[in-house]
Amino acid sequence: MDYEFLRDVTGGVKVRMSMGHEVVGHWFNEEVKDNLSLLDEVEQAARTVKGSERSWQRAGHEYTIWMDGEEVMIRANQLDFSGGEMEEGMSYYDEESLSLCGMEDFLRVVAAYREFVSKA
């Protein structure tokens, strides 16, 4: 899982992820932004579910993050729409609406994000 952190002209951090993990980047860009307390909550949840049968989920404005002891799933909340709610002929490109990755890989990105943000 490759990633890149950039700063826009306003100094805001933008995350770009490799193909198949784009939604992870969107989650950082839309849900985390500068809200490092959300990352605290996610890391605490990861410690809680790691090595257990439990899972944890947090619905955000645009994306929901779900994790169990081994993997993390981030999905666009728009995926909750049933087929009848979408306009005829419309469908969502799931690869850009859903990403799965390993817990350890995800936590490495979280740590790298924190480090990048702290170098303001």
Swiss-Prot record:
Signal peptide: none annotated. Belongs to the UPF0231 family. This is UPF0231 protein YacL. It comes from the Bacteria. InterPro entries: UPF0231. The gene is yacL. Pfam families: UPF0231.
